[in-house]
Amino acid sequence: MSKEKFERTKPHVNVGTIGHVDHGKTTLTAAITTVLAKHYGGAARAFDQIDNAPEEKARGITINTSHVEYDTPTRHYAHVDCPGHADYVKNMITGAAQMDGAILVVAATDGPMPQTREHILLGRQVGVPYIIVFLNKCDMVDDEELLELVEMEVRELLSQYDFPGDDTPIVRGSALQALNGVAEWEEKILELAGHLDTYIPEPERAIDQPFLLPIEDVFSISGRGTVVTGRVERGIIRTGDEVEIVGIKDTAKTTVTGVEMFRKLLDEGRAGENIGALLRGTKREEIERGQVLAKPGSITPHTDFESEVYVLSKDEGGRHTPFFKGYRPQFYFRTTDVTGTIELPEGVEMVMPGDNIKMTVSLIHPIAMDQGLRFAIREGGRTVGAGVVAKIIK
């Protein structure tokens, strides 16, 4: 049992494979689990186990995703792989599988293709912080100059979307040969694992980030004051801490005079816990659902932002018809809907169900937001799209 216990103390990092269709993402995923299991222990996963990915729902959207796990000597990885291009788009936009870093798979036989570019762009828009490149099918290319050319193209493409193309690790390998147990190609998988360990920094745990609690409910308790309830999204809140109430109205400061959970008084509330926070000198009507409690100065309210959006298809329960500029749906952030207007990119007249699109949104009330915040687009309580804040305008 002692081994199991030790495993859990390793840092946990979320990664995934991205790249063009048929460039070998799933084969590479299988190869990583197989080679690392052989060298460092753990469970190997066969190609077909990964390829028939189970359906899951994220924000009402059906996504096919495979989750595998593997270990290196220093870390534990959770790795996500999607069978289809549409699944990647949905996955990255909804944040169903948050990635601390991605492995971009490019076939050396093809070089960068349209989805290579699209996945890099999506990675930039949704805030995937690090990309490592696996140049696949190198066993089928014996021309060194060609490999160098493909490598150069990939680096240029990464730089175009503000990733550090010149410094990005690129591994030349063959996922299939590694999966088949050929030693020289297995080495390349170990080399890739080494880059995962060193190039992707250890993610900051939610509990170490600045305190944030999306407010779900507000009520007043006679003789004690106003209590807000919700689930702590990140950080820790302690009795006596000063906090800001951010969003919808002007930002206000107050002090937390008590933290309670299941009607018991605590000293603190931590990320992941459902708590009630008693606020000093704050009236019930000054606060509403949709605002957040936050560490002072850690988050600001905004109305205008650029976003990357996936519009649900009719089959997913989305709209049956396209929408045009001047569309005014509700944008659901954390716990509340806010009406907003949209601007479409130049030359785009309409958006069809099933499309993914970049759009600029202007909300009628400010919402506490930072880059990477996820939201749903709703019409009368029905989800018709999912999006992520790519850039704050004002």
Curated annotation (Swiss-Prot):
Chain positions covered by the region annotation G3: 81-84
Full protein name: Elongation factor Tu 1
Positions that bind GTP: 19-26, 81-85, 136-139
Ranges for region G2: 60-64
GO molecular function: GTP binding; GTPase activity; guanosine tetraphosphate binding; translation elongation factor activity
NCBIfam families cross-referenced by the UniProt entry: EF-Tu, PRK00049.1, PRK12735.1, PRK12736.1, small_GTP
Gene3D superfamilies: P-loop containing nucleotide triphosphate hydrolases, Translation factors
Cellular localisation: Cytoplasm
Region G5, residue ranges: 174-176
The reaction(s) this protein catalyses: GTP + H2O = GDP + phosphate + H(+)
Family stated for the protein in its record: Belongs to the TRAFAC class translation factor GTPase superfamily. Classic translation factor GTPase family. EF-Tu/EF-1A subfamily.
Domain of life: Bacteria
Keywords: Cytoplasm, Elongation factor, GTP-binding, Hydrolase, Magnesium, Metal-binding, Nucleotide-binding, Protein biosynthesis
Summary of the function given for this chain in its UniProt record: GTP hydrolase that promotes the GTP-dependent binding of aminoacyl-tRNA to the A-site of ribosomes during protein biosynthesis.
G1: annotated segments: 19-26
Gene that specifies this protein: tuf1
Boundaries of every tr-type G domain copy: 10-204
Broad class of the protein's primary localization: cytoplasm
InterPro entries, alphabetized: EF-Tu_GTP-bd (IPR041709), EF-Tu_GTPase (IPR050055), EFTu-like_2 (IPR004161), EFTU_2 (IPR033720), G_TR_CS (IPR031157), P-loop_NTPase (IPR027417), Small_GTP-bd (IPR005225), T_Tr_GTP-bd_dom (IPR000795)
Assigned EC number: 3.6.5.3
Region named G4: 136-139
